[in-house]
C-alpha cells in the first residue's frame, strides 16, 4: 500500500493525476488478485493521485489553468504545496494502514506465461525503457521548456510527442514485425477524447460569459465584503470541489479575482492576489485535494470508480472521512508554514 501510494503521488506530478491513476490501476489488477483488497487500494490511489497532482503545475487541469494563467509559477507551487500535499496523503494512508489493512494484502508476481499476452516480445527491452523515459520526460520537462523558451506549454508537449513519434517509427523500421503489431502514434490519434476537450472548452466559455457580463465581479465584491479572508475562500472552494467540478470553480475564481500587479503600496489584502500570492497557491492545493472527499469530486475518482465498479457509499463510508482529515491536516500545515 505504501509503495503504491507513493508511486501514485509522484507519478501524478509527472503525468497528471488522471493518467497516473489509470496506469496504477492497471498495475494493481495484476498485483492484487482479491477484489475486496483491490477496492481499498483503488480508493487510496484516488487520494494519493489528487494529492500528487496538487503540487505540480501539470498535475491537474486546475493547476494547469493557474500556471498558464500566470497566477502561480512552477517552482513557487512546488516549493509551497509539496509538503501540505504530502501530509494530505500520509495522514489518510497511515489511518488506512492500521484501520483497513490490519491483515495486509497478498500480492503476486506474474509468471512469464501470464505476461506473454500483455506485450509484444519482439520489442527489445532497451527500446521499451527508452519509450517510457521519453514519454515521462516529455511531460515532466514541460515547465522547464516554458521557462527557457517562454513559449506556450502545449508546444512542449507537442515537441515530446514529435520525439516519441520519430523514435517509435525509427524503431519499427528496424524490426521485422507485421504492420498490425506496430503500435504507431498515428494509430492513437483517432482515439483522442474530444468529448472531454469540448467539455472543458464549454466550461471556460461559460465562465468567460459570466465574467464579461459582470456576474463574477458582483460575486467577488460580495465575498470581499462579507468574508474578506482569502484563505477561507480557498478552503471553501476546495470543499465545494468535492461535489462541483473543480475546473469550473477555479476558472470562475480566476475570473472573479484578476491578478493584481505588484506594487509597493498594495494593501495586505491585495497582496494575496498578486502572481504567486497566497490565495492562488492555497487554491492550487485546496481545489485539487478537495476533490478526494467524495469519489465523484474529481475526474480521477470518477475514472477509478468506473474501472473498478466502486460503489459511491463504499467510498463514502470508508474513505471520505480519511480524505477530509487529510485535507484539513494539509491545509493546517500550509497555514503553519506560509500564512
Task: Give a label for each model feature.
Residues 2-6, 42-43, 78-82, 129-133, ...:
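Hydrophobic alpha-helical transmembrane segments
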Residues 6, 10, 86-95, 133-141, ...:
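Generic alpha-helical transmembrane segments of integral inner-membrane proteins
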Residues 11-18, 22-48, 52, 61, ...:
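Membrane-interfacial helix-loop connectors
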Residues 35-36, 55-56, 65, 75-123, ...:
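Juxtamembrane and boundary regions of transmembrane helices in multi-pass small-molecule transporters
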Residues 74-84, 124, 146-156, 188-192, ...:
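Interfacial loop-to-helix junctions that mark the boundaries of transmembrane helices
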Residues 119-133, 181-204, 221-225:
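Membrane-water interface at loop-to-transmembrane-helix junctions
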Residues 140-166:
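Flexible hinge motifs at transmembrane-helix junctions and intramembrane kinks/re-entrant loops
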Residues 141, 145-147, 208-218, 334-339:
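Transmembrane helix-loop junctions in multi-pass membrane proteins
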Amino acid at each position: 500500500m505504501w509503495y503504491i501510494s507513493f508511486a501514485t503521488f509522484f507519478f501524478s506530478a509527472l503525468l497528471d493525476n488522471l493518467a497516473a491513476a489509470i496506469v496504477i490501476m492497471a498495475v494493481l489488477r495484476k498485483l492484487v488478485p482479491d477484489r475486496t483488497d483491490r477496492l481499498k487500494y483503488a480508493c487510496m490511489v484516488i487520494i494519493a493521485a489528487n494529492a500528487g497532482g496538487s503540487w505540480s503545475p501539470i498535475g491537474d487541469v486546475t493547476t494547469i489553468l493557474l500556471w498558464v494563467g500566470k497566477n502561480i509559477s512552477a517552482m513557487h507551487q512546488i516549493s509551497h504545496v509539496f509538503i501540505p500535499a504530502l501530509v494530505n496523503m500520509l495522514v489518510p494512508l497511515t489511518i488506512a494502514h492500521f484501520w483497513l489493512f490490519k491483515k495486509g494484502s497478498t500480492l503476486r508476481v506474474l509468471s512469464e506465461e501470464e505476461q506473454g499476452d500483455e506485450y509484444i516480445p519482439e520489442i527489445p527491452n532497451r527500446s521499451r525503457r527508452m519509450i517510457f523515459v521519453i514519454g515521462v520526460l516529455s511531460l515532466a520537462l514541460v515547465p522547464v521548456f516554458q521557462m527557457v523558451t517562454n513559449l506556450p506549454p502545449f508546444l512542449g508537449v507537442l515537441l515530446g510527442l514529435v520525439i516519441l513519434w520519430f523514435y517509435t517509427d525509427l524503431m519499427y523500421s528496424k524490426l521485422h514485425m507485421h504492420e498490425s503489431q506496430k503500435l504507431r502514434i498515428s494509430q492513437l490519434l483517432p482515439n483522442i477524447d474530444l468529448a472531454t476537450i469540448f467539455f472543458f472548452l464549454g466550461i471556460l466559455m461559460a465562465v468567460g460569459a459570466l465574467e464579461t457580463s459582470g456576474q463574477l465581479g458582483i460575486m467577488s465584491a460580495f465575498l470581499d465584503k462579507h468574508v474578506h479572508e482569502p484563505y477561507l475562500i480557498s478552503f471553501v472552494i476546495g470543499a465545494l470541489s468535492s461535489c462541483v467540478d473543480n475546473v469550473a470553480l477555479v476558472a470562475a475564481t480566476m475570473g472573479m479575482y484578476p491578478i493584481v500587479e505588484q506594487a509597493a503600496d498594495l494593501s495586505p489584502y491585495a497582496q494575496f492576489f498578486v502572481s504567486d500570492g497566497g490565495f492562488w497557491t492555497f487554491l492550487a492545493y485546496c481545489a485539487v485535494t478537495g476533490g478526494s472527499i467524495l469519489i465523484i469530486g474529481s475526474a480521477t475518482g470518477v475514472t477509478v470508480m468506473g474501472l473498478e465498479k466502486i460503489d459511491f457509499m463504499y467510498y463514502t463510508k470508508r474513505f471520505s472521512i480519511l480524505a477530509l482529515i487529510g485535507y484539513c491536516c494539509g491545509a493546517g500545515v500550509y497555514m503553519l508554514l506560509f500564512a
